[in-house]
Regions:
Chain B
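Short amphipathic recognition helices of helix-turn-helix/homeodomain-type DNA-binding modules
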Residues: 59-63
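Short basic helix-loop element that most often maps to the first helix and adjoining turn
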Residues: 3-22
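DNA major-groove recognition helix of helix-turn-helix/homeodomain DNA-binding modules
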Residues: 43-58
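Residues in the helix-turn-helix
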Residues: 18, 29, 58
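Recognition helix of helix-turn-helix/homeodomain-like DNA-binding domains
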Residues: 25-38
Protein backbone atom coordinates (compact mmCIF):
# COMPACT_ATOMS: atom_id res chain seq x y z
CA UNK A 1 0.00 0.00 0.00
CA UNK A 2 2.79 2.42 0.94
CA UNK A 3 4.65 1.54 -2.23
CA UNK A 4 1.65 2.23 -4.46
CA UNK A 5 0.80 5.39 -2.53
CA UNK A 6 4.38 6.45 -3.21
CA UNK A 7 3.75 5.83 -6.91
CA UNK A 8 0.81 8.22 -6.82
CA UNK A 9 2.69 10.84 -4.83
CA UNK A 10 5.73 10.57 -7.09
CA UNK A 11 3.50 10.80 -10.17
CA UNK A 12 1.82 13.93 -8.81
CA UNK A 13 5.16 15.46 -7.86
CA UNK A 14 6.66 14.96 -11.31
CA UNK A 15 3.51 16.09 -13.10
CA UNK A 16 3.54 19.23 -11.03
CA UNK A 17 7.21 19.84 -11.91
CA UNK A 18 6.52 19.21 -15.60
CA UNK A 19 3.60 21.63 -15.64
CA UNK A 20 5.60 24.24 -13.70
CA UNK A 21 8.47 24.03 -16.20
CA UNK A 22 6.12 24.37 -19.17
CA UNK A 23 4.04 27.09 -17.51
CA UNK A 24 7.13 29.11 -16.58
CA UNK A 25 8.46 28.70 -20.13
CA UNK A 26 5.23 29.96 -21.67
CA UNK A 27 4.77 32.88 -19.27
CA UNK A 28 8.40 34.04 -19.32
CA UNK A 29 8.57 33.48 -23.07
CA UNK A 30 5.48 35.64 -23.60
CA UNK A 31 6.89 38.31 -21.26
CA UNK A 32 10.15 38.33 -23.22
CA UNK A 33 8.33 38.55 -26.54
CA UNK A 34 6.07 41.33 -25.27
CA UNK A 35 8.90 43.28 -23.63
CA UNK A 36 11.10 42.89 -26.70
CA UNK A 37 8.33 44.10 -28.98
CA UNK A 38 7.30 47.03 -26.79
CA UNK A 39 10.89 48.16 -26.09
CA UNK A 40 12.02 47.28 -29.62
CA UNK A 41 14.81 45.08 -28.27
CA UNK A 42 15.42 42.02 -30.43
CA UNK A 43 17.63 40.28 -27.83
CA UNK A 44 14.65 40.18 -25.45
CA UNK A 45 12.53 38.48 -28.12
CA UNK A 46 15.27 35.91 -28.74
CA UNK A 47 15.70 35.43 -24.99
CA UNK A 48 11.94 34.94 -24.60
CA UNK A 49 11.91 32.22 -27.26
CA UNK A 50 14.96 30.62 -25.65
CA UNK A 51 13.29 30.55 -22.25
CA UNK A 52 10.14 29.10 -23.83
CA UNK A 53 12.15 26.32 -25.46
CA UNK A 54 13.92 25.68 -22.15
CA UNK A 55 10.50 25.28 -20.51
CA UNK A 56 9.45 22.76 -23.14
CA UNK A 57 12.76 20.92 -22.79
CA UNK A 58 12.27 20.93 -19.02
CA UNK A 59 8.81 19.41 -19.45
CA UNK A 60 10.14 16.63 -21.67
CA UNK A 61 13.27 16.10 -19.57
CA UNK A 62 11.35 15.79 -16.30
CA UNK A 63 8.89 13.37 -17.92
CA UNK A 64 11.76 11.33 -19.33
CA UNK A 65 13.61 11.13 -16.01
CA UNK A 66 10.53 10.45 -13.87
CA UNK A 67 10.95 7.16 -11.98
CA UNK A 68 7.26 6.30 -12.55
CA UNK A 69 4.87 6.70 -15.47
CA UNK A 70 3.49 10.22 -15.23
CA UNK A 71 0.09 9.03 -16.49
CA UNK A 72 -1.78 6.05 -15.18
CA UNK A 73 -3.02 3.47 -17.71
CA UNK A 74 -6.43 5.06 -18.27
CA UNK A 75 -4.92 8.49 -18.81
CA UNK A 76 -2.39 6.96 -21.22
CA UNK A 77 -5.22 5.30 -23.13
CA UNK A 78 -7.18 8.57 -23.33
CA UNK A 79 -4.04 10.15 -24.76
CA UNK A 80 -3.63 7.33 -27.32
CA UNK A 81 -7.27 7.48 -28.40
CA UNK A 82 -7.15 11.28 -28.73
CA UNK A 83 -3.98 10.99 -30.82
CA UNK A 84 -5.62 8.34 -33.00
CA UNK A 85 -8.66 10.56 -33.52
CA UNK A 86 -6.41 13.50 -34.40
CA UNK A 87 -4.56 11.38 -36.97
CA UNK A 88 -7.86 10.22 -38.47
CA UNK A 89 -8.91 13.85 -38.94
CA UNK A 90 -5.53 14.77 -40.47
CA UNK A 91 -5.69 11.73 -42.78
CA UNK A 92 -9.19 12.69 -43.92
CA UNK A 93 -7.98 16.23 -44.64
CA UNK A 94 -5.04 14.90 -46.66
CA UNK A 95 -7.21 12.43 -48.58
CA UNK A 96 -9.68 15.17 -49.53
CA UNK A 97 -7.30 18.10 -49.97
CA UNK A 98 -4.41 16.60 -51.97
CA UNK A 99 -6.41 15.36 -54.98
CA UNK A 100 -8.94 18.19 -54.67
CA UNK A 101 -6.31 20.92 -54.89
CA UNK A 102 -4.56 19.03 -57.69
CA UNK A 103 -7.76 18.91 -59.75
CA UNK A 104 -8.41 22.62 -59.16
CA UNK A 105 -4.87 23.47 -60.25
CA UNK A 106 -4.80 21.18 -63.31
CA UNK A 107 -8.19 22.33 -64.59
CA UNK A 108 -7.30 25.94 -63.88
CA UNK A 109 -10.53 26.39 -61.96
CA UNK A 110 -8.67 28.05 -59.07
CA UNK A 111 -5.12 29.14 -58.49
CA UNK A 112 -4.40 27.45 -55.20
CA UNK A 113 -2.40 29.74 -52.86
CA UNK A 114 1.00 28.47 -51.69
CA UNK A 115 -0.32 28.41 -48.14
CA UNK A 116 -2.67 25.52 -48.96
CA UNK A 117 0.06 23.58 -50.73
CA UNK A 118 2.19 24.12 -47.64
CA UNK A 119 -0.57 22.64 -45.51
CA UNK A 120 -0.93 19.60 -47.78
CA UNK A 121 2.84 19.10 -47.73
CA UNK A 122 2.81 19.23 -43.94
CA UNK A 123 -0.03 16.70 -43.81
CA UNK A 124 1.95 14.41 -46.14
CA UNK A 125 5.02 14.75 -43.88
CA UNK A 126 2.88 13.86 -40.85
CA UNK A 127 1.56 10.79 -42.73
CA UNK A 128 5.14 9.69 -43.45
CA UNK A 129 6.14 10.19 -39.82
CA UNK A 130 3.13 8.11 -38.72
CA UNK A 131 4.19 5.37 -41.15
CA UNK A 132 7.75 5.38 -39.83
CA UNK A 133 6.53 5.41 -36.21
CA UNK A 134 4.22 2.46 -36.95
CA UNK A 135 7.06 0.54 -38.56
CA UNK A 136 9.33 1.23 -35.57
CA UNK A 137 6.66 0.27 -33.03
CA UNK A 138 5.74 -2.85 -34.97
CA UNK A 139 9.38 -3.95 -34.92
CA UNK A 140 9.61 -3.27 -31.18
CA UNK A 141 6.49 -5.32 -30.44
CA UNK A 142 7.20 -8.28 -32.76
CA UNK B 1 -16.82 -5.06 -18.45
CA UNK B 2 -19.27 -5.76 -15.65
CA UNK B 3 -17.69 -5.99 -12.24
CA UNK B 4 -18.54 -6.05 -8.56
CA UNK B 5 -15.82 -3.67 -7.52
CA UNK B 6 -18.18 -1.23 -5.72
CA UNK B 7 -19.65 -4.01 -3.59
CA UNK B 8 -16.25 -5.42 -2.70
CA UNK B 9 -14.99 -1.95 -1.88
CA UNK B 10 -18.02 -1.22 0.30
CA UNK B 11 -17.54 -4.47 2.18
CA UNK B 12 -14.05 -3.33 3.09
CA UNK B 13 -15.19 0.22 3.86
CA UNK B 14 -12.79 1.54 1.23
CA UNK B 15 -13.33 4.70 -0.78
CA UNK B 16 -12.43 4.90 -4.44
CA UNK B 17 -9.44 6.99 -3.42
CA UNK B 18 -8.31 4.29 -0.96
CA UNK B 19 -8.53 1.61 -3.63
CA UNK B 20 -6.81 3.85 -6.16
CA UNK B 21 -3.94 4.40 -3.75
CA UNK B 22 -3.75 0.69 -3.04
CA UNK B 23 -3.29 -0.25 -6.69
CA UNK B 24 -1.41 2.86 -7.87
CA UNK B 25 -3.89 4.49 -10.24
CA UNK B 26 -5.99 7.63 -10.08
CA UNK B 27 -9.37 7.74 -8.34
CA UNK B 28 -10.91 8.61 -11.70
CA UNK B 29 -9.60 5.33 -13.11
CA UNK B 30 -11.30 3.32 -10.36
CA UNK B 31 -14.49 5.29 -10.94
CA UNK B 32 -14.33 4.61 -14.69
CA UNK B 33 -13.83 0.87 -14.11
CA UNK B 34 -16.76 0.72 -11.70
CA UNK B 35 -19.00 2.55 -14.16
CA UNK B 36 -17.94 0.20 -16.95
CA UNK B 37 -16.37 3.05 -18.89
CA UNK B 38 -12.88 1.59 -18.88
CA UNK B 39 -11.56 -1.97 -18.97
CA UNK B 40 -8.42 -2.32 -16.85
CA UNK B 41 -5.20 -3.80 -18.19
CA UNK B 42 -4.36 -7.36 -17.21
CA UNK B 43 -1.76 -6.01 -14.80
CA UNK B 44 -4.25 -3.73 -13.06
CA UNK B 45 -6.89 -6.49 -13.02
CA UNK B 46 -4.38 -8.75 -11.25
CA UNK B 47 -3.59 -5.98 -8.76
CA UNK B 48 -7.30 -5.44 -8.05
CA UNK B 49 -7.87 -9.18 -7.63
CA UNK B 50 -4.90 -9.41 -5.27
CA UNK B 51 -6.23 -6.46 -3.28
CA UNK B 52 -9.55 -8.27 -2.74
CA UNK B 53 -7.94 -11.68 -2.45
CA UNK B 54 -9.94 -13.21 -5.28
CA UNK B 55 -9.50 -14.28 -8.90
CA UNK B 56 -9.93 -11.87 -11.78
CA UNK B 57 -12.88 -13.86 -13.13
CA UNK B 58 -14.61 -13.63 -9.74
CA UNK B 59 -14.50 -9.86 -9.99
CA UNK B 60 -15.00 -9.22 -13.71
CA UNK B 61 -17.68 -10.63 -15.96
CA UNK B 62 -17.05 -10.17 -19.69
CA UNK B 63 -20.67 -11.04 -20.62
Amino acid sequence: MNETRNVLETREKYRSRMNSALGAGIVLGAVGLLAGTLLDRDPLVVLGVGVYWLGVLGYVGIKWRAPVEVRDEREARINREAAELTLDVLAALLIVAAPGLTVLTVTGAWTVPEFYWGMVTMLAVVAMIVGAANWYTERKRS
Amino acid sequence: MNNDLPERRDERGMSQADLAAAVGVSRQTINAIERDRYDPSLELAFDLAAEFDCRIEDMFDPN
